[in-house]
Amino acid sequence: MSSELETQAQIRSGRYQVLLLLCASAAIAYIQRAALSVPAQEIAHDLHFIDFARDMGSIQSLWYFAYAMMQIPGGWIADRLGARKALVIFCVVWSLATLLAAFATGYRTLAVLWGLMGAAQAGAFPCAAKALGRIFPETHRARATGMLAAGMTIGGAIAPILAALFLEALVPTSQLLSTERWRLLLALYAIPGLLWAALFWYVVSDRKLPASEGNQAHRPAIDWMRLVTSLPLGLLCAQQFFRAAGMVFFTTWFPTFLQKTRGVSQLDSGVLTTIAGIGGVVGSLTGGFCSDWILRKTGSQRLSRQGIAVVGMGACSLLIVLSYFCNDIYQSIALITLGAFCATFGGVSGYTVAIGFGGKNVATVFSTMNMFGNIGAALFPITAGWLVAKTGNWNLILFLFAGVMAIDAVCWAMLNPQGTLFGDENESDSNASS
């Protein structure tokens, strides 16, 4: 009993240290996955793409398809190995895949290597969700997921300007080594993930983040029939499909969209994309705290989880449409930034509800939801690329973004966020009380 109490005390005392490291891994992952966006036209030229919009769109989409298809296997691995061990393995593999992508010789090799990196990253966020469900109680969970989402958004926000600055700084080295600067960028981006994996393994002990409560060998089998026939989970997956499809705009086509529709430079497109991303960071942080505050004040999952999601996604859709009618680029960016704020403000509900639904199988349920999200994220770049290739109108991407966010709001309006999918308690219920 004393050993169990000591473990519970270590979980409580170390939870924010674990959360900080998880946020750092999220930022690293999002910086790496957005590495192709800013130098997209350079890569297409150097690797002799036949059709820029179609070929680059298909590579971006392949990343998300690979990521989506590995979600459930990644979640299953996290539930079996525990978040600590699984996350370190995933991080090392995806960082090495990023390094290999620097040696791509053409469209096919880049597509395969980028898809491999996506597959390796697939287990990261099921692991993070499992960890948060393990160490945070219900009344603190939205702020924790909001901070994790902020880590993702920070990575996505700084990725464009970071890539643009690095690409400029790497010009002399590129000339000295007689190699393309985007290759050096990918090689450079592989380093933080490897360093993070070593730090996480050293700092976060099994006592701070236990694999799971109880004996893994006696864990009951997952009721897959209930999983695939649950209406609430179906709606949760649907909202993730549309939300992720919309938000991937910022990490794929947005810099190029600004270059094509507003005539800005590569560096300026990175800066403006980062500004929009900052709105997303602030939205994630404030949304998580606001959601938990509403839950403590009202005790209502409907208001605290569902309510802010409906308002956030609906407002985002409206603001994105309004941005199209602004002739001034800075007014347009301001509206898009506010739209990103609203989307991430409400977006924290998805992760929070998934952790609640998951009970003692958080990673599996979360990864199921995230799989559908990444199918949506995979379809958006290729659909946007196809629209531009067919019409030559880059503004259609903006309306595509607004449309999917509006549908996302409808999904949330129909979703009941209460209860757990398997009727069990959450892993944190007995050992992560505040």
Give, region by region, the residue ranges found by the protein language model:
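Structural signature of the two symmetry-related core transmembrane helices
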Residues: 85-99, 302-321
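Extracytoplasmic gate region of multi-pass secondary transporters
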Residues: 36-37, 230-287, 347, 351
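Extracellular/periplasmic helix-loop-helix junction of adjacent transmembrane segments
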Residues: 39-68
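Conserved MFS/SLC helix-loop-helix module at the cytosolic interface between two early adjacent transmembrane helices
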Residues: 69-108
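Juxtamembrane intracellular "pre-TM" segments in multi-pass secondary transporters
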Residues: 4-11, 207-237, 261
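Cytoplasmic helix-loop-helix junction between adjacent transmembrane helices
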Residues: 113-152
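Helix-loop-helix hairpin linking two adjacent transmembrane segments in secondary transporters
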Residues: 148-202
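Helix-breaking motifs and short loop linkers at transmembrane-helix boundaries and internal kinks
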Residues: 48, 82, 103-109, 120, ...
